[in-house]
């Protein structure tokens, strides 16, 4: 159903339900979840990478001076959804199961499992392999603005560009974060036990994430494209 969610035909009421679940499952508390992994006291170089990510997520200190949850809410205001829309919603059952898993893995006694869940799985994308094998250069302002112009919320829903700083922030800082994510997990999942735990973690995460996305699509009454 993802092509429908990012396509021109989805009504705003359905789009709102999708974003409500995204916000409560991980967007609102993502800096806190990262901090839970940092609090497991990984090696100093990993703490530095996590701290930089937390700093950006919680303050926007590397981009626009506002936390990513705040920037998300700003983007939602551009769609006509106020903050109360997200405060008063409830998680769907599958969304709650995925969120509970995120809380469990970030409290793992082995920090590398939590790092794999958040930095590799949640923040990752289909482009990760390409990014790791051939790291992209930081995008220029012109390239970022071209990306904004092509964004589905601009093209299909008429959101004003001034509300899109969350997407700008992602384009500005995410390339470096992808390198950090794989560095910390690949370099420190040294034992067979750790490697198996990481694989089990992301496999479980994928199953829960797919069930979560399917439940949102069902609640939105969407059909597979």
What are these regions (language model features)?
Residues 48, 55-163, 207, 217-222:
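Active-site-proximal alpha-helical scaffolds that flank and shape metal-associated catalytic sites
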Residues 162-194:
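Long amphipathic all-alpha helical oligomerization modules
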Residues 12-22, 42-64, 114-121, 162-172, ...:
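Alpha-helical scaffold segments that form or flank carboxylate-/histidine-based iron centers
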Residues 13, 17, 91, 222-225:
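Sequence termini and other peripheral, non-core segments
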Residues 6, 10-42, 60, 113-133, ...:
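Alpha-helical bundle segments that constitute or directly flank the non-heme di-iron/ferroxidase center
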Residues 1-2:
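Acidic, low-complexity proline/glycine-rich segments
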Residues 34-38, 73, 77, 151-152, ...:
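Amphipathic alpha-helical segments within well-ordered protein domains
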Residues 177, 187-225:
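Acidic, carboxylate-rich catalytic segments that either coordinate divalent cations
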């Amino acid at each position: 159903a993802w092509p429908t969610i990012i396509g021109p035909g989805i009504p705003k009421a359905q789009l709102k339900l999708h974003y409500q679940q995204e916000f409560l499952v991980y967007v609102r508390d993502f800096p806190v979840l990262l901090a839970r992994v940092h609090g497991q006291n990984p090696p100093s170089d990993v703490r530095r990478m996590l701290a930089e990510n937390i700093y950006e997520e919680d303050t926007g200190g590397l981009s626009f001076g506002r936390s990513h949850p705040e920037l998300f809410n700003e983007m939602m205001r551009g769609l006509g959804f106020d903050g109360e829309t997200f405060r008063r919603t409830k998680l769907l059952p599958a969304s709650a199961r995925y969120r509970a898993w995120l809380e469990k893995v970030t409290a793992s006694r082995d920090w590398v499992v939590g790092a794999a869940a958040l930095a590799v799985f949640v923040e990752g994308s289909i482009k990760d392999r390409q990014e790791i094998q051939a790291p992209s250069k930081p995008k220029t302002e012109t390239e970022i603005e071209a990306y904004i112009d092509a964004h589905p919320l601009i093209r299909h829903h008429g959101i004003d560009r001034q509300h899109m700083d969350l997407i700008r922030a992602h384009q500005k800082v995410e390339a470096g974060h992808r390198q950090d994510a794989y560095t910390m997990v690949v370099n420190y999942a040294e034992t067979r036990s750790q490697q198996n735990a990481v694989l089990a973690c992301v496999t479980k995460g994928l199953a829960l994430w797919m069930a979560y996305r399917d439940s949102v699509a069902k609640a939105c009454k969407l059909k597979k494209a």
